[in-house]
């Protein structure tokens, strides 16, 4: 069995917001999967406790350093108000999200970010404010989707951006 450290989650908060989370623990196998489970649980606990995106990512960073020194992970955390489309995002060494606008344009976002989790106990993770228009698509992904051996990762990101721009919008009911 092949297991790894990638994870994603959608967490409903008490304030009717949605936390959209994606992360990638270094390595493969049981150790990476175990660390992933701990990080996923930590992110859930910080989120349910009402922490801001920066606090969630900073707290998860500190936890990883304490629990598993030498291990690291990337993470992107977006706290979305689905009614207004407003979101706050924090990023820890994770690939930039993509945004497909309602008119079909797709772009690689330029979110501020900090270092990967597990490296610097004093790291900060600045928040970036986003506004998602009705019909927009926010794409979170791990490097495994866009990495090709021997190729620049930016080429893979561009292929994904192009595919997202060319995708036919489908109502959620379908």
Language model features with spans:
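Catalytic-site or vestigial catalytic-site microsegments of nucleotide-handling domains
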Residues: 22-28
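Residue-level marker for buried hydrophobic side chains located in beta-strands
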Residues: 21, 91, 138-140
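Active-site-proximal, acidic helix/loop segment immediately C-terminal to a metal-coordinating Asp/Glu
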Residues: 28-50, 108, 121, 126, ...
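DG-centered beta-turn motif at the end of beta-strands
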Residues: 24, 94, 142-144
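Catalytic core of PPM/PP2C metal-dependent serine/threonine phosphatase domains
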Residues: 4, 12, 18, 30-115, ...
């Amino acid at each position: 069995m092949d297991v790894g450290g990638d994870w994603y989650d959608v967490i409903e908060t008490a304030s009717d917001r949605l936390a959209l989370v994606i992360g990638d623990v270094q390595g493969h196998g049981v150790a990476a999967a175990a660390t992933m489970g701990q990080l996923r649980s930590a992110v859930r606990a910080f989120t349910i406790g009402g922490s801001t995106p920066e606090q969630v990512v900073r707290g998860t960073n500190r936890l990883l350093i304490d629990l598993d020194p030498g291990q690291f992970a990337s993470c992107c955390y977006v706290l979305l108000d689905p009614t207004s489309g407003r979101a706050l995002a924090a990023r820890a060494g994770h690939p930039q999200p993509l945004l497909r606008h309602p008119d079909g344009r797709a772009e690689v976002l330029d979110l501020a970010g900090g270092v990967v989790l597990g490296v610097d106990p004093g790291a900060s993770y600045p928040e970036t404010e986003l506004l998602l228009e009705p019909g927009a698509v926010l794409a979170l992904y791990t490097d495994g989707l866009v990495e090709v051996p021997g190729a620049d990762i930016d080429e893979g990101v561009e292929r994904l951006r192009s595919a997202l721009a060319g995708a036919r919008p489908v109502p959620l009911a379908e």
